[in-house]
Amino acid sequence: MESAARELRGVLIQELKQLEKVRTYDELRTQVNDIAVMLAKRMRDAIIDDMDFAFRNGYSSAYGEIKGINKTAAKAPDLKPEDIEVLRLLKTEGALYNAYNQFQNILVEKMNATIMAGIAQGSSIPEIVQNMRQVGIGETYKLTRIARTEITQIANEGRLRGYKRAEGRMGIQFKYSLIIGKDTRTCPAHQELDSRIPSSGMYLNDLIMLQQEVGSKYRMNLRGHSLLHPNQRTSLVRIV
């Protein structure tokens, strides 16, 4: 995601540099939508690719951690249809889905506002384009930041699926925990969750029930099994 975002910022800079050559404000406005459509499509494609990779890599790496399982191949078995359905839902709902769907409209709106402000201030076209560039880079950064935290959640969901597949093959239940970031950005809900998970871990259903209890107390919008809510640096792990 980070490399794709850097590449797109470079593309944005080049596209806007060409706009410095236009002669009228009307011509400048007509180019905004085309640039926004191009950037939105490329951002969406990069995000979808990263979501798919994060889920599948989480699944295969979690399954591969399990020792003593009768593995018939060097890699994890193929995803089950229900796993693929979970991945499909993760791609079509939630904060990241909303963010990349709104990206194009927000970009068009803010770039047009920048043009109108520049006209009102009597700015030259190159000056307006410079301000448009900052808007585009800023919006790309915001979407990348949302994607970073949401894709962590998707990787956790993949890990959960890998662990559950191994549980089924071995006929036993594992214990799990959450590695939760501990700094000033950690919300009270996660602080409480961290303090209530025993060092020996918890069976999955018990961990889910604890998350639901804490989430309800703090009025969190729970999504998925492995995170309390998306805006935390939290990873699902199996306790050995």
What residue ranges belong to the model's regions?
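Activation/maturation switch segments at domain boundaries
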Residues: 1-50, 149-240
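Residue-level detector of solvent-exposed, low-hydrophobicity positions
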Residues: 62, 66, 70, 104-110, ...
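N-terminal leader/targeting and assembly helices and adjacent pre-domain segments
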Residues: 1-137, 239-240
